[in-house]
Amino acid sequence: MNNYKHLSGFFARISNDEEINPTHISLYMALFQFWNCNLFKNPVTISRDEVMQISKISSKATYHKCLKNLHALGYINYEPSFNSFKGSQVHMVCLAKKIQK
């Protein structure tokens, strides 16, 4: 996984996406960091509290809204867990594009 190409693809995509705001970007960057720590292997198990802390999102409603938006817009695949002992699963969608020189 080339994280430079992935992030370049992400920023190219959000530049044309009117539905994405800074909170979505912050959340995506936090999820990207978890994916990085997981050696870029899908799925990534996440904890709401940890992701909220890293992304600096203080409202659970905002967190869930942005997570569902990222899923609906095709940036991630989100599989919620309703078990407090088992984290939710996030699959990071490949956004890497060939970089034009």
Role assignments for model-derived ranges:
Residues 35-97:
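Winged helix-turn-helix DNA-binding recognition segment
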Residues 1-54, 72, 101:
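Short recognition helix of helix-turn-helix/winged-helix DNA-binding domains
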